[in-house]
Amino acid sequence: MTRPTLRETVARLAPGTGLRDGLERILRGRTGALIVLGNDENVEAICDGGFALDVRYAPTRLRELAKMDGAVVLSTDGSRIVRANVQLVPDPSIATDESGTRHRSAERAAIQTGYPVISVSHSMNIVTVYVGGERHVVADSATILSRANQAIATLERYKIRLDEVSRQLSRAEIEDFVTLRDVLTVVQRLELVRRIGQVIDNDVVELGTDGRQLRLQLDELLGGNDNARELIVRDYHASPEQLSEAQMTATLDELDALSDTELLDFTALAKVFGYPTTTEAQDSAVSPRGYRALAGIPRLQFAHADLLVRSFGTLQNVLAASASDLQSIDGIGAMWARHVREGLSQLAESTITDSLS
């Protein structure tokens, strides 16, 4: 059975959920609590004493049961309270960095059973959730919103810079004057935007219903970013052949695996794309295959763009093709040929206009 991840568990504890309501009632009562979010034979094996309930979950019931010293065990889906006032007896040999008895039991139980375990400290009024070997302190919405709003401001600055370098790359593509450095600059900015977006997305998940406005802002700022990453990999990977889906995914995974320090190093980015890792190579000329440019043509499907790239090889060859040349490609009829030809002409004109403005 697949065990819940930390992200999934945090979403279950977000404002607007029944579990969060119960936790807030416990915090206000300052009684503390130990709650296991799942039940099977592994959980039963570490439970001692207490009593079976098997009643429907309700925040008020959780609050009342938490007044007792023992732990509360919920069903795996969280819909029922299975047991209450039980003593958790996990394997004491499991390593833990916690000092309090409740927190040590929670961490060990989470590791041993694979289910999330929540510990509520009555003295510090803090909720901590343990998932496997991970530990997460649940913050209040005001704290998360303050942090997320600062991150949104940073993301907006990153997005402005990304748009600038993307326009510069598009202009260089039309003029056939692209260097590897131009490409890596855009790749770097795309990745920076994606990473800070992930941080904010985690905050949005933790905010639950309190993060709706933040979700709208994030979606607007990140719209098309993942697609742009895929297109630039297809356009500029050093492979002499068109990338397969597996190769493209592997390249994106390599980008994901770069540390923040490596992301600032163009030689590390060049290596991911299959280019030499020398500084001199960054000023070498490269030619796009044309996926990015063709994606800018309204209503043009990827399948049609892929046909054109595989037939003509480079963007410059596509730009030089007439409507009849485009129509000669199997799968590209007269209507699409005219549409592509007009779209490329408009793209070139708008790019030149932007460079003059």
UniProtKB/Swiss-Prot annotation:
What are the required cofactors?
A: Mg(2+)
Enzyme class of the recorded protein, top EC level: transferase
**Which positions in this protein are listed as binding ATP?**
70, 88, 101-105
The reactions it catalyses are: 2 ATP = 3',3'-c-di-AMP + 2 diphosphate
Coiled-coil stretches noted in the UniProt entry, renumbered to this chain: none
Keywords, comma-separated and alphabetical: ATP-binding, DNA damage, DNA repair, DNA-binding, Magnesium, Nucleotide-binding, Nucleotidyltransferase, Transferase
User: Pfam families from the xrefs?
Assistant: DAC (PF02457), DisA-linker (PF10635), HHH_2 (PF12826)
Claim: Membrane is one of the keywords in the record:
no
A biological process (GO) of this protein is:
DNA repair
Source organism superkingdom: Bacteria
Q: Where is the DAC domain?
A: 3-141
One GO MF term on file is:
diadenylate cyclase activity
Could you say which EC number(s) this protein's record lists? Answer: 2.7.7.85
Q: Which InterPro entries match?
A: DisA, DisA/LigA_HHH, DisA_sf, DNA_integrity_DisA_N_sf, DNA_integrity_scan_DisA_link, DNA_integrity_scan_DisA_N, DNA_integrity_scanning_protein, RuvA_2-like
Q: Which SUPFAM superfamilies match?
A: RuvA domain 2-like, YojJ-like
NCBIfam families from the UniProt entry: PRK13482.1 (NF010009)
Q: Which family does it belong to?
A: Belongs to the DisA family.
Subunit and partners? Homooctamer.
Q: What does this protein do?
A: Participates in a DNA-damage check-point. DisA forms globular foci that rapidly scan along the chromosomes searching for lesions. Also has diadenylate cyclase activity, catalyzing the condensation of 2 ATP molecules into cyclic di-AMP (c-di-AMP). c-di-AMP likely acts as a signaling molecule that may couple DNA integrity with a cellular process.
Q: Which HAMAP family match?
A: DisA
Q: Which PANTHER family match?
A: DIADENYLATE CYCLASE, DNA INTEGRITY SCANNING PROTEIN DISA
Task: Please identify the protein, giving its name as recorded.
Answer: DNA integrity scanning protein DisA
